[in-house]
Each structure stands twice: as structure tokens, then as C-alpha cells.
């Protein structure tokens, strides 16, 4: 009998101190700073993803409805459907990009800073500019690849514009993306050679998915260049970016994370009102290319 009743003091302690079960009707989890409510189509409703930001992002789009036209398609049909879905977005001026990046790339641990793409360094938002020690606007799809410059359109599309250290941005220049080369001393984990740049592992997938977006959004029918991915480096001023086979591998090696989802949501809700399909559905890259 003594062995069977060993738990009674513990039960009594619960009744004395009081205990309340988590309420299912409360909506957000108790520790809301660890989660974002992101637009993911699931049979059971919204899926919660780990998130370092203190902000709780509410789904602004039912992605199943948003991508309805693309459902069941693959190859060129899928690419064309996605192009129609994400075209017609709100275009920013190049000066408006500064403030947009201060929100989309805000450091979740310090709201006064942004996270730089290639170094993942946190730097003051006020340090945007063109001097050593500043950060500027990196065109992941190099603007010389298609010569679209910084006019409203591909040159100001924040789905591929990211904060980067001025010197690192200059070192990357207009190189295509590939594996290999020498490590760039001011950005450990990044490698480069004569015609290509390899970003650090943490952002390889981010880079790939930004380039996939650009190749789908800009198809040449709306006054902008027809941007396409190929399996080459050294593309120069042609409207191409490589290296496609490597980008497809990076898309798998570095899966979509909560920071990308949060960024996609902010761009959709607050700025351009279109989404990057390859953040919502990274598997579509293999279905198209």
C-alpha cells in the first residue's frame, strides 16, 4: 500500500499551489517570441515555426488560394503560371529600398540593426551608405546582368535586394554564383575566384531562391529584360545568372528558414504585395528547372 500511494504528496502539492493547463483558445503559444504565424497551407491550419524575432507575424495570405493558378502544373506551364501570379507588384523607388531593407532584414535581437547578407553581421541601420564600414543595397541578381540598373522594377525589387557590407558587396561585384575559390578575408565562409562567388552555407539557399524568383518574375513581356538562369559563370552583361545546377543543390542544402518566411511575409504585406513562390514552395525549383 505504501508503494502505491507514493504519488499522493505530489498531487496534493498541485492542488495547494494551483495549476492551470495551457488554454487551447488562447491562440498564440505562451512563449510568443519564439514563433511566427506564417502562411502555410496545411490540413490542420496554421503551422508555427521557430522564430527569433519578438514580433508575431500573422498570415496575410492563404497560399493555397494565392497559388491556385499554379496547382497541378510543372515545367514551363508552372513557370508561366507563377509569373502571372507574382507580376503587377507595387514597385519601389531606389531610395525607398533603404527603409524597406531596414524592416525586412532587421536584426531580431536588436531592432536598431540589420543583418548583412554575406557576413550575417549585425550592423546599425543608421550605417547605410557608401563608405567603408557602411552597408549598402546588394543586388543578388547583379544589375549588370541584363543592364536594368536601379530604375523601378528589377533594380528595386526587394525580393532580391539585401543589406551587405560595402566592401564585401564590391568584392562580389557582378559575379555569378558557384562553388570554390579562395576565402574572402572580410567575409569568412565566402569564397570567390575570377568569375564566381560562393556565399556562406547559412545563406546559400536564400541566394538560390532569390534568383529563382527573379527568373520567373521577369520574363521580358513588360518592358523589363527576360532574366534567365543558365549553367554557366562569367555571363557578363547578358540577362543570365548561373550556375543553375549549383543553385538547385543549394536550395536543398540550405532549406527555407523562419527568417526567410518572415521576410517574404513583410514584403507581401507592407511593400510589394507579391510573394517569392520558392520560399513558400521550394520544391517548385526542381519542377521548373
Curated annotation (Swiss-Prot):
Residues 1-24 form the signal peptide. GO terms for molecular function: nuclease activity. Its EC number is 3.1.-.-. It is found in: Secreted. It comes from the Bacteria. Its main location: secreted. Pfam families: Endonuclease_1. This is Extracellular ribonuclease. The gene is bsn. It is an enzyme of class 3 (hydrolase). One of its GO terms (cellular component) is extracellular region. Residues 177-197 are annotated as: Disordered.
